[in-house]
Amino acid sequence: MSMFKVSLICSLLLVVFGAARGFLGRGDAFRRKVSVELNPGLAPPLSLPPGVGLVHLRGLGDNDTLHFVLCNAGAPALLLVHSNSTRSAVTVDWPEFINSSSAGSLRVEPESSVTYSSALVFTRLWEYDDVNNTADPQKAAESSFYPPYELQNFVWSELNTTLNQSEHTVVLCGGEKTQSFSNGSLCLQVSVFESQGRDEAWPSLLHNANSSQLRVWINGVTPRGNNSRFILEFQSVGDAGFQSRVDMRSSIDDEYTPSIFKVSEWVSSPVNSSSVWGFSQWKPVAYRKARPVFEDATACRHSELVFVNGTPPSAVIQAYFTHNTRIYGLNISFGLAEDPVFYDATKYISWTVLMGLGDPPSDSFSPLIIIIITVGLVTPLVFIILGGVFVCVRKRTSQSTAYEPIN
């Protein structure tokens, strides 16, 4: 009986940990080989004027290529182009690009290999005096808004000083020549990934090899009011054959982003189709310190999606998109209603968004949580089965050893 029970326990444990191992083995194993290039194709005697530069981040797959291009000329923008060729390349007609950013001066060749293109452009930074502490720009009086900061007029840092080849990241910082930005800046950090993973820093968005990450922060900017809050305005540019919508998904797990159970997804689909070709994804949370603790988190909300007429004032957008485009605009506002902590308290706010190809990554439980759930569900079942087996064996043993009269 003892050997039977031991064998049964071992079998059940193998089932439990086999199931857990099956869960742990799942995941996105797709990888890309990422390379980073500054000002592709630029050669002497050509040189760039101050404040003009391109960074090309290339993700090479087994049978396709994903191109990301960051430009600091005009309003900062990140361009995404997918090609079904492993030999595709970014080519720039530098004289045309420098002089007028004329349409077609930046291309991905062969052009016939391009299947999808989109871009995110950061156009304005708004500031308003939230005297009623609603953290809702829609409820703020028009007179409480200050003139917006036009990001196309910012003086941006040189890209070659912040390019990290090994980490596949680049940081772009800029500001106005005004008192507000005398000791402050608005910065964007772009990261491109070889495989699935997460940043250690909150909000720890799940990324994959088809996505890039933009982290935006405002640091040290002197507010123009005692109760100032900021709004980031940005636009999505894509081909005319695509339409956009913003979806909100809920989750039962806040393991990676404490107290946040929702994720917003700005997705792009072909007209008259629900299939997703591209996305921007973020969680409705921002942070008031560079190294935040739980208390440094604050809410952020997005406005309604609106259709925008006119090309954004960005050199890379004007240089790449040669055909009809469809442009949408969205605002992200920061702050929580009735929160006594305004921007002036820390003079810092950060927000993170993913931009990528295909369906947005979807959060799932971590390996630790899966093991805990599996063991928690199966352990009671093990004891029930063992109890039943023990009772049955004990009963049979009692019957077989009972006194039987001799005929």
From Swiss-Prot:
Residues 390-407 are cytoplasmic. It comes from the Eukaryota. Residues 1-22 form the signal peptide. The keyword Membrane applies. One of its GO terms (cellular component) is lysosome. Keywords: Glycoprotein, Lysosome, Membrane, Signal, Transmembrane, Transmembrane helix. It is a single-pass type I membrane protein. The keyword Glycoprotein applies. The chain crosses the membrane at residues 369-389. Required to protect lysosomal transporter MFSD1 from lysosomal proteolysis and for MFSD1 lysosomal localization. Interacts (via lumenal domain) with lysosomal protein MFSD1; the interaction starts while both proteins are still in the endoplasmic reticulum and is required for stabilization of MFSD1 in lysosomes but has no direct effect on its targeting to lysosomes or transporter activity. This is Glycosylated lysosomal membrane protein.
